[in-house]
């Protein structure tokens, strides 16, 4: 078994399309396993850039069912089945998520039933590779354990009606990576994030002049401000804190806050190691957490 523990941000963006920040998705490589957290827009393209065949994905974890976190799910599931150097999955697509995962995958199977039928008849693809193996959960606790990799789900607070929504703590080789998912300031993130080697957290910010707008207040109210992220990082004390799902709100008249402004607000409450995540940024987790920027459009 390999001792490698690596986290790569495949997509660090939001529902609004961006060529620089694809939809939320994170690749976790732990020993001999490859796990995906969420499946936002463009995840398959980022996997291709990393030379990671979709058929190598051992487990798809879902945090919640907002479309920006699931829109690439059918692409990963279907394209990973096709006969190619990038696919050729012959075993069921394994999915773990909070209540709703089974309904989501059953509906995808119905939506693509004609395509599946045609490809089986025309390309002789195995039905075993398009089958799904879905596990749901509805409370905090371990949801997966195999070959030294342990995944613990914990509920977070993405808003009063945006439920269920969960984060993940992944343990391997005595190391820990924690992923907040979409959430407001939440004590469960602090509980499960304490002492993590890497804590990957969402963040949202708008300029003060935009905060008077009701829809902006509503969006910010579903996420964590840089100031509150700093409070969380100060209490959890990770070796490295990193942002993903970077929400920089704007309007026609008001530009988005800059990343410099975002970091400046974090520094009001946190003075430790910090990275503002970028697509294809990776973190090698060992005695220290090493950051690599891998963005490439080749």
Where are these regions (language model features)?
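Binuclear metal-dependent hydrolase catalytic cores
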Residues: 1-177, 256, 261-290
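Short glycine-rich anion-binding loops that position phosphate/pyrophosphate groups of nucleotides
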Residues: 156, 205-206, 295
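Cap/insert and terminal regions of metallo-dependent hydrolase folds
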Residues: 167, 174-176, 184-281
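A polyampholytic, Gly/Pro-enriched intrinsically disordered region
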Residues: 292-298
